């Protein structure tokens, strides 16, 4: 009591202390970064390696496997996957969440250095790594277009001038340049001319290589001067290469131009990018794990004017896609919901108190508590994001509860005739322990959340600490600032016995009278009330088990990612045409703003698209509805399939799949995997719970298989190396020389002219020189036949792997899809040699489902322990916790009513309800215990008196919490799909709990009091018997 008196008697100190809390919070608010969600990025490192012309199988065995063996020794790797395609290998390492990304990068570099001696000698460069997740959507896409410059020149500008500059910006991990390739001198050989001039392909390669060299020539000097020697040993343009002498036919000179067409072109002619219906080069920008997306994008935008100055006037640099507008809009909506919640809560207080002065007290306490929280958020390294702002919105109802309980009790004493200061001191002393119990037990709910690890723990941690801080500050304000303001602001109020019987006060009075009558009736039918209570326990179990579940609500970010998968034997030109048609059809949709995409590179049959939708306020359909419409519209494109998925802020794993969820098949025997994967994929494709079912297993690519007759080769004086060199020279786009320029390096690329590679007859024109200098046709020692070959080879760990990706159609949830997959695997009788595991988000969802009930139980046990310590009782905490089953039923029924699946956000709502609804029981039970102890009342008299006297503050606190959550439940606009499940859960739980616990709590209080008395009587009788 002395502590409370200190704050009441020193209003200046109390006011300034509260002002200091507010100022620190305001400063923290201005310094807080902004983000869509708490930082939950897994440390992911992606390694790239290339060997131009190598088949996927060659890349897998000679590049991927040695690297995997070295990288697999690194500590802290959760998952290692690799994908090898034509001429390239990509290895993705997903580390434990607690692994520092920079430490991981150092370990990766050391492993790459150690494996260098195991890699093929023909690799043009060492493997390189990026600290980015290939499965993440890019944060920004820039495009380069020009009416005067070709794609090779644009690509050169993008990679040489822009990509390096952007990569240096803080927060940027990787800048991928797509839609083309670097300029190059291309040598297109004519097999007929080579035959007629008796020139081999290797003669041409050696001649070009020896004619373009760059080596130091030294210098000459005397006593006075020094001269560096510089020669014209380097050739830079196609016109410089054409006169090269490649062979002598007796006295006749054969120049390169006699046997080939030499042009200034690009390294890889089989790559194309498009944006806005015109050719474009794309700069796809990804952020580093842990980097703030909005700050990173802001830094990039700040650099754009300088970047444009580096480009010729004829080149246009545009922002094709920016991830941040919808993030900013979503946060603005949450802030609006927070403001509405504060206003509604204060309105509730005013309706009950009917006094401007009295309403001013919680109207001050709420913002002080909320604003002060920002300082703690800043010190903890948090951000202003959807979850932290939702925590503050929900906290509005919590923080006002404490002020309401104190204010209402002080007001009651003033109405009974006490002076304001006396009423303030007496009132806060009476309910101080109640407020402390309410706050500490509410904080206890979040202790298990704070101890959680993994992605879910990271998501919950920021929410829990933000809410806990707001509750802690609210507790302090309610026991200091609130009684002080009551003592000084309420002094003009005089007792008015009937003042509360007008308007809203009259309604509450009638409700209280009605409650008194119905409570007496309930006390006469205790068994029925207990039966209802037990029924709610069973209903909770049924509703939870049968509830449709998902990992995280599907967000409408206004961004879609598109993946085109075509026939495995498709040509680049056909693939480019299909991409163009797909993009034109998508761009014509009424809700689509822009489409950017590219195809080519190592995967000729694949294309990628980045689609921006119109702002949510300008379209009538959600992102998923747009996807469904486009899926139907584009389903009949022959030879190609389009897969679309919405960009999400929460995505686990490192796989770049064609759909949102993945199911991976693993086998030690590749033949077993090839046998079962098509059967499983077909079965899953027929399930109604899945859509867009596809696999990364591509083993039906067209191949021309050559078989060497080694005996004949030996007789003819030809070795396998010579034969392979012939094929590489002819068909491998072989990079045979390097052109060194001031800002970059370019290649000289040699292959047979495209007109001679249209069919298998090209092999008949191939000749190799034997050891005697004789020209031997390829057909003399080799035979060939068409076959199938893999377009990609995939590993997980060191096992062969194939990932089946899928989306979930409307009307079903992720839990439905997972159950259907597991059921199908059992029905198919898949052997133990083929193992199926969920990956990425689906895997995290499975782990979360297993821990949800444990988490809820841990929260309940923690609250029980805290309440037991506070009340020094085993029984009273059970009475207080008896309010939870009805809240659970209300929450789960509300989710069903609004057709909302049970997700992590709904789980947060359930955890909050554990803290909210027990407040009413605490208010009731605490008063009854005091009345029994000090008023010498029976248990029934005490609980009836407590129920009636505390009816008004119970209704006030419930309505405050309900109206605090109502803006979330009724929210619309950007990010509403995140806010609604939380609001629905809280509002539904509060309504059902309020309806039932006003009756069940008194009955259960009396039940446990009877148990306590019988137990005490039994102990007493035992003592007497022993005496």
Curated annotation (Swiss-Prot):
Keyword terms of this UniProt record: Cell inner membrane, Cell membrane, Membrane, Transmembrane, Transmembrane helix, Transport
The answer to whether keyword Cell membrane applies is yes
MF terms from GO for this chain are: xenobiotic transmembrane transporter activity
In terms of InterPro entries, this protein maps to: AcrB_DN_DC_subdom, Acrflvin-R, Multidrug-R_MdtC
Which Pfam families does this one have?
A: ACR_tran
Q: Which Gene3D superfamilies match?
A: Multidrug efflux transporter AcrB pore domain, Multidrug efflux transporter AcrB pore domain like, Multidrug efflux transporter AcrB TolC docking domain, DN and DC subdomains, Multidrug efflux transporter AcrB transmembrane domain
Where does it localize? Cell inner membrane
GO CC aspect terms: plasma membrane
Q: Which organism is it from?
A: Proteus mirabilis (strain HI4320)
GN (gene name): mdtC
Membrane topology of the entry: Multi-pass membrane protein
Report what the protein is called.
Multidrug resistance protein MdtC
Tree of life domain: Bacteria
**Where is it chiefly localized?**
membrane
């Amino acid at each position: 009591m002395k502590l409370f008196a200190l704050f009441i008697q020193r209003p200046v100190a109390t006011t300034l202390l509260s002002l200091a809390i507010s100022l620190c919070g305001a400063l923290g608010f201005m310094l807080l970064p902004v983000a869509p969600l708490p930082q939950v990025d897994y440390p992911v490192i992606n390694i790239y390696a290339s060997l131009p012309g190598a088949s996927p199988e060659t890349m897998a065995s000679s590049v991927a496997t040695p690297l995997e063996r070295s990288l697999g020794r690194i500590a802290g790797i959760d998952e290692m996957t690799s994908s090898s395609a034509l001429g390239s290998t990509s290895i993705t390492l997903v580390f434990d969440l607690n692994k520092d990304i920079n430490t991981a990068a150092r370990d990766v570099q050391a492993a790459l250095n150690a494996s260098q001696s195991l890699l093929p000698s023909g690799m043009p460069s060492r493997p390189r790594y990026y600290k980015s997740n290939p499965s993440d959507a890019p944060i920004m896409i820039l495009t380069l277009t020009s009416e005067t410059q070709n794609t090779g020149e644009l690509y050169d500008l993008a990679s040489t001038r822009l990509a390096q500059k952007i990569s240096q910006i803080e927060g940027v991990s990787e800048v991928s340049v797509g839609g083309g390739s670097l300029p190059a001198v291309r040598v297109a050989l004519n097999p007929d001319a080579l035959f007629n001039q008796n020139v081999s392909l290797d003669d041409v390669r050696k001649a070009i290589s020896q004619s373009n060299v760059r080596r130091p020539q030294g210098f000459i000097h005397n006593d006075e001067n020094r001269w560096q020697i510089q020669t014209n040993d380097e050739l830079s343009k196609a016109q410089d290469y054409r006169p090269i002498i490649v062979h002598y036919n007796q006295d006749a000179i054969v120049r390169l131009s006699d046997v080939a067409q030499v042009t200034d072109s690009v390294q890889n002619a089989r790559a194309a990018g498009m944006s806005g219906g015109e050719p474009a080069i794309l700069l796809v920008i990804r952020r580093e794990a842990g980097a703030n997306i909005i700050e990173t994008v802001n830094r990039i935008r700040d650099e754009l004017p300088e970047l444009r100055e580096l480009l010729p006037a004829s080149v246009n640099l545009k922002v094709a896609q920016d991830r941040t507008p919808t993030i900013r809009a979503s946060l603005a909506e949450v802030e609006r919901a927070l403001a509405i919640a504060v206003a509604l809560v204060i309105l509730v207080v005013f309706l009950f108190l009917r006094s401007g002065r009295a309403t001013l007290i919680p109207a001050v306490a709420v913002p002080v508590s909320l604003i002060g929280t920002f300082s703690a958020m800043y010190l903890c390294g948090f951000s202003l994001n959807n979850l932290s702002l939702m925590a503050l919105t929900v906290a509005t109802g919590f923080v006002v509860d404490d002020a309401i309980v104190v204010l209402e009790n002080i007001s009651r004493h003033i109405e009974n005739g006490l002076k304001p200061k006396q009423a303030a001191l007496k009132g806060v002393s009476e309910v101080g322990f109640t407020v402390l119990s309410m706050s500490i037990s509410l904080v206890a709910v979040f202790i298990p959340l704070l101890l959680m690890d993994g992605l879910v723990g990271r998501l919950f941690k920021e929410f829990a600490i933000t809410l806990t801080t707001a509750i802690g500050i609210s507790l302090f304000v309610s026991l200091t600032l609130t009684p002080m303001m009551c003592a000084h602001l309420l002094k003009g109020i005089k007792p008015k016995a009937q003042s509360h019987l007008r308007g809203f006060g009259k309604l509450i009075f009638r409700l209280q009278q009605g409650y008194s009558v119905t409570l007496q009736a309930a006390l006469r039918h205790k068994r029925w009330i207990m039966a209802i209570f037990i029924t709610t326990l069973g209903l909770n179990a049924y509703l939870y088990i049968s509830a449709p579940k998902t990992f995280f609500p599907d967000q409408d970010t206004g961004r879609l990612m598109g993946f085109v998968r075509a026939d495995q034997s498709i040509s680049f030109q056909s693939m480019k045409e299909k991409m163009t048609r797909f993009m034109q059809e998508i761009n014509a949709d009424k809700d689509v703003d822009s489409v950017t995409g590219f195809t080519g590179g190592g995967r000729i049959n694949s294309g990628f698209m980045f689609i921006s939708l119109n702002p949510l306020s300008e379209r009538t359909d959600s992102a998923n509805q747009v996807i469904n419409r486009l899926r139907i519209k584009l389903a009949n494109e022959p030879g190609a399939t389009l897969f679309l998925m919405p960009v999400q802020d929460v995505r686990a794993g490192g796989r770049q799949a064609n759909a949102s969820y993945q199911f991976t098949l693993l086998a030690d025997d590749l033949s077993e995997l090839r046998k079962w994967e098509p059967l499983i994929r077909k079965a899953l494709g027929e399930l109604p719970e899945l859509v867009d079912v596809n696999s990364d297993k591509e083993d039906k690519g067209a191949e021309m298989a050559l078989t060497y007759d080694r005996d004949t080769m030996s007789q003819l004086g030809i070795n396998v190396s010579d034969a392979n060199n012939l094929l590489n020279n002819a068909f491998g786009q072989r990079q045979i020389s390097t052109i060194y320029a001031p800002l970059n390096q370019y290649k000289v690329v040699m292959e047979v002219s495209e007109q001679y590679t249209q069919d298998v007859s090209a092999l008949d024109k191939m000749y190799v020189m034997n050891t005697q200098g004789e020209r031997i046709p390829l057909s003399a020692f080799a035979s060939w036949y068409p076959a199938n070959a893999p377009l990609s080879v995939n590993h997980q760990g060191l096992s062969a792997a194939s990932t089946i990706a899928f989306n979930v159609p409307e009307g079903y949830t992720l839990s439905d899809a997972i159950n259907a997959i597991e059921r199908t695997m059992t029905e198919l009788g898949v052997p133990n040699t083929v193992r199926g595991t969920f990956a990425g988000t689906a895997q995290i969802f499975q782990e979360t489902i297993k821990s949800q009930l444990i988490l809820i139980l841990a929260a309940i046990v923690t609250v029980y322990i805290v309440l037991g310590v506070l009340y020094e009782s085993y029984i009273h905490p059970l009475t207080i916790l008896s309010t939870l089953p009805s809240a659970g039923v209300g929450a789960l029924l509300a989710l069903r009513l609004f057709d909302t699946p049970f997700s992590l956000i709904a789980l947060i709502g359930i955890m909050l309800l554990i803290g909210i609804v027990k407040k009413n029981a605490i208010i009731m039970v605490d008063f009854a215990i005091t009345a029994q102890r000090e008023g010498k009342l029976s248990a029934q008299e005490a609980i009836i008196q407590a129920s009636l006297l505390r009816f008004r503050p119970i209704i006030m606190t419930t309505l405050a919490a309900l109206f605090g959550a109502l803006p979330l439940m009724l929210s619309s606009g950007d990010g509403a799909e995140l806010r609604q499940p939380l609001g629905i859960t809280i509002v539904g739980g509060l309504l059902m709990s309020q309806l039932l616990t006003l009756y069940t709590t008194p009955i259960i209080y009396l039940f446990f009091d009877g148990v306590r008395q019988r137990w005490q009587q039994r102990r007493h009788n035992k003592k007497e018997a022993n005496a």
